[in-house]
Amino acid sequence: PNGCGKSTLLSHLYRLHPSKNKITLNEKPLESYKGREFAQLVAVLTQSRDAMIDDFLVKDIVLMGRYPYKQHFGTYSSEDVKIAEHYMNEVGITHLSNEEIHHLSGGEKQRVFIAKALTQKPQILLLDEPTNHLDMKYKVALMKQLRAFKGTTIVVLHDLNLAAQYCDHIVIMNNGTILKEGSPTEVLTPEILEPIFEVPFKTSWDEGRYHLYY
């Protein structure tokens, strides 16, 4: 539910230091990674956007995903440009490449930043509500793309049916606490969800897919 601590938990995974204990990546404390090294491993999509890039072109923002690989004072390589163009095509924004981002709709902007994260070619994607502002076509396309991603994806979602259909492992949170984690069918049950959301739930299988109704 809203305000349960999902975004805060995610932020700790991209180097917001916890007040106690440690978080490790590949058995190495997060705080020991240098910025460039960490950015080559982890790409992040947050809910906030930097207003300083409002006048940037779409293609330039997506190309920023290659920044962790750029040599000091160097320019982006032809391979960097090729990678950026590939992911712009993947998320359906090639036709917007020469537009300034402040001219775009919310859904179009979201796809730009998703393309930027993918252009980073990380091992891990951290995505905070990536389906926000997207219509159903692009929600489904994004989730299929994330399923095909070769690394690890950690995503905050409010759409429980999308989570049921595309996620392997689900963590349910409430009031800053992890209540339950496991497979979709283990976690997304009326017994667990009804006390949290205070609405009745039903579940069913349809053509091999697990669905929730409320």
What do the predicted segments below correspond to?
Residues 63, 78-96:
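Conserved ABC ATPase "signature" region
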Residues 75, 100-104, 108:
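Conserved ABC ATPase signature
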Residues 125-129:
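Catalytic Walker B motif of ABC-type/P-loop ATPase nucleotide-binding domains
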Residues 21-31, 38:
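Conserved ABC transporter NBD signature motif
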Residues 190, 194-214:
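ABC ATPase nucleotide-binding domains
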Residues 13-14:
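Helix-to-loop junction immediately C-terminal to a conserved catalytic motif
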